[in-house]
Regions:
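Extracellular loop-to-transmembrane helix junctions
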Residues: 2-19, 72-102, 111, 331
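Selective recognition of specific alpha-helical transmembrane segments in multi-pass small-molecule
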Residues: 7-17, 130, 134-138, 170, ...
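Membrane-interface "cap" regions at the ends of multi-pass membrane proteins
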Residues: 10-66, 264
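Helix-loop-helix module between adjacent transmembrane segments
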Residues: 10-11, 90-106, 110-174, 240-244, ...
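Hydrophobic, membrane-embedded alpha-helices of multi-pass small-molecule transporters
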Residues: 47-64, 200-206, 217-283, 333-345
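Loop-to-transmembrane helix boundary motifs in multi-pass membrane proteins
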Residues: 121-127, 131, 157-161, 271-280, ...
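Hydrophobic alpha-helical segments and their helix-loop junctions in multi-pass secondary transporters
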Residues: 138-142, 146-161, 170-171, 191-221, ...
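Extracellular/periplasmic helix-exit of transmembrane alpha-helices
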Residues: 201-214, 270-320, 390-394
């Protein structure tokens, strides 16, 4: 518990001190934002700051800081260090500066920013890469909620159809019609679940692995046959959304088009990432208790769940912990956490993909027919990937690993683009150069040495 409290305080101090330093480096001013200068009632819509924050938080979070932190907790207390240092010095910097660059460039999407700072060839690679990643995000976040809902009633295929139908509607409608109205509610639910678990941590005061117990790979010691991942680079791929995630750079332009002032960028972009880091920290702590100090070892409970047809272990951990610690309320919160949150992440992923394709092909998005023309191929590709995922018993975990690698590779493009911007502006580029070098090393190493990387 001492490590958990120290790490939580570190995230708060990181926002207050380092976040303010990064803000001074960028130097926001009072120029008109895209929400004002380019208002169109569809994607460029000025919204209240609190609503922009809640939507940004849910867009970048979803179940990423839950599932990723749970799987990363298998490595042991070393996961704490990646969450706090990654979040403060890499992830929040990445999110803030990518969001602010989008603001400064008329709400431009990530491929457009990469083209401006890294050149046309890099932008073309990123365009394909980003759309593929976003389709993969939508696919990953169809399967897990459909499986959970299928265990409650109805068939898994039926729930997949329902979720896809929602995706089509949410992707095409103006951003303030569905996303602007219901996302803040789901954000509150996700935060409330994390706060409730923090309260229960202090009530139960469980014995937890601490940093001074050692930074070795606890997963390999506890389950040597079932857990074979190495700390480097696998930990830094597994915990993405709680530390740094390239996916966030595809989402920040959505809110950059809804922000009324540049000066609110730090609490919106940097603050949302720090908040996500806190959620990841909570779930990493709870998961470490589950795997290593619970009355019945977590690996045994997961094996029992798999025997009953529950193949995705991370959602199962959420259900087991929430129901055990929070009772009936926990079951409701778990539903919101592992059903609603991934669905909302999926629909904003497809929305981002639609906007990226539209901007690349210069297709006007005001006519509904134009939006539909882009959406149909995206959903067909996602459905094909989903069929493969269903046919493969380990499909979810395989896609999650590829999603994690693609996610972090996207962050590499973003960090190098921001570094070039800072060099051109004669600003302290070291704040993104070091994270860019580190994440480049992580992604190339994973591709070169991980068995999962060549699993297909």
């Amino acid at each position: 518990m001492i490590t958990f409290v120290i790490c939580l305080a570190a995230l708060v101090l990181g926002y207050a001190i380092y976040g303010r330093f990064v803000e001074r480096v960028f130097a926001p001013d009072d120029r008109p934002t895209p929400a004002i200068a380019k208002a169109d009632g569809i994607d460029y819509v000025a919204m209240p700051y609190w609503k922009v924050f809640m939507i940004q938080f849910l867009n970048i979070a979803g179940t990423g800081p839950i599932f990723g932190a749970i799987m990363g907790a298998k490595f042991g207390p070393v996961a704490y260090l990646w969450i706090i240092f990654g979040c403060i010095f890499a992830g929040a910097v990445h999110d803030y500066l990518s969001g602010m660059l989008s603001l400064r460039n008329g709400g431009s999407d990530l491929p457009s920013l990469v083209r401006q700072y890294l050149g046309g060839a890099a932008a073309k690679v990123l365009l394909v890469f980003a759309v593929f990643l976003l389709i993969m995000v939508g696919t990953v976040f169809v399967y897990s909620p459909a499986e959970i809902l299928g265990h409650m009633g109805g068939s898994k295929v039926m729930w997949m159809g329902v979720i896809f139908a929602y995706y089509i509607v949410a992707t095409m409608l103006p951003i303030d019609k569905i996303i602007g109205k219901i996302y803040p509610v789901f954000s509150f639910s996700l935060l409330f679940m994390a706060v409730a678990l923090v309260v229960m941590l202090f009530v139960k005061m469980p014995v937890l692995p601490e940093l001074w117990d050692g930074l070795g790979n606890m997963g390999q010691k506890t389950d040597p046959e079932g857990f074979t991942d190495s700390i480097f680079p696998c930990l830094f791929i597994t915990i993405a959304c709680g530390a740094i995630s390239g996916f966030h750079a595809t989402q920040s332009p959505l809110m950059a088009r809804c922000l009324k002032s540049e000066r609110k960028g730090r609490p919106i972009f940097y603050g949302a990432m720090i908040t996500e880091g806190m959620v990841a920290l909570v779930w990493a702590t709870v998961a470490m208790w589950f795997f290593y100090d619970a009355p019945q070892p977590g690996y045994e409970q997961i094996a029992g769940g798999a025997a009953n047809g529950f193949h995705t272990s991370a959602p199962m951990v959420v259900n087991l912990v929430c129901n055990d610690w929070l009772g009936v309320l926990g079951g409701i919160l778990a539903m919101l956490g592992v059903v609603a949150a991934p669905i909302t992440s999926g629909d904003t992923a497809f929305r981002s993909a639609r906007l990226i394709v539209a901007q690349a092909l210069k297709i006007n998005q005001l006519p509904k027919a134009n939006r539909l023309y882009i959406c149909i191929p995206l959903f067909v590709a996602s459905f094909a990937l989903l069929i493969w995922q269903i046919s493969n018993p380990d499909g979810f975990n395989t896609i999650w690993q590829y999603f994690g690698w693609a996610n972090q590779t996207l962050s590499v493009f973003t960090l190098w683009s921001i570094t070039v911007y800072l060099v051109r502006e004669k600003k302290p580029y070291i704040i993104t150069l070091i994270p860019a070098l580190f994440m480049t090393c992580v992604c190339t190493t994973f591709l070169a040495v991980s068995k999962t990387a060549f699993g297909l």
